[in-house]
Curated annotation (Swiss-Prot):
Originating gene: DIF1
Family named by the database record: Belongs to the DIF1/spd1 family.
Its biological purpose: Mediates the nuclear localization of RNR2 and RNR4, 2 subunits of the ribonucleotide reductase.
Organism: Saccharomyces cerevisiae (strain YJM789) (Baker's yeast)
Keywords per UniProt: Cytoplasm, Nucleus, Phosphoprotein
Chain spans, region Disordered: 1-37, 107-131
Transmembrane residue ranges: none
Low complexity compositional bias, start-end: 16-30
The protein, known as: Damage-regulated import facilitator 1
Length: 131
């Protein structure tokens, strides 16, 4: 039996064996990553549940206070600074201005006006028809 395996392995070049092994390893890695991706939602839910279960009443009260929020943005992305949000007292910017707004824009008043029925005569094959 060993002689047959040696003879069979001598027929297949080493390069092909290496390529097959690499392809199998890549396929295993892809399968592993697919499995990880498919279970990410469940893992997130578990972590959230664990966070709610381990939270004590004092930490839940503290989590509602705005001073507890920590800014980790400079650690995650270096040289990142958070831009301040506008205050609620300022009005939002207008979507249109004088240059983009047409004075002859359609309005509901123009739509409510009933136009008289279009009555005119047309010529079809030399005979008059009334529409």
């Amino acid at each position: 039996m060993d002689a047959q395996l040696e003879w069979a392995s001598s027929l297949v070049p080493k390069r092909q064996l290496q390529q097959q092994q690499q392809q199998e390893q890549q396929q295993q890695q892809q399968d592993f990553h697919k499995d990880q991706l498919m279970t990410v939602g469940m893992r997130i839910r578990q972590r959230v549940d664990q966070g709610y279960a381990s939270r004590t009443p004092s930490t839940s009260d503290a989590s509602l206070q705005p001073g507890v929020i920590r800014d980790y943005s400079s650690v995650i992305v270096p040289q990142f600074t958070r831009s301040p949000l506008p205050t609620a007292n300022s009005l939002p910017p207008m979507l249109i201005n004088q240059r983009t707004m047409s004075t002859e824009a359609s309005s509901l008043e123009k739509w409510d006006v009933a136009e008289p029925a279009a009555e005119h005569e047309t010529m079809v094959n030399g005979s008059k028809r009334r529409l």
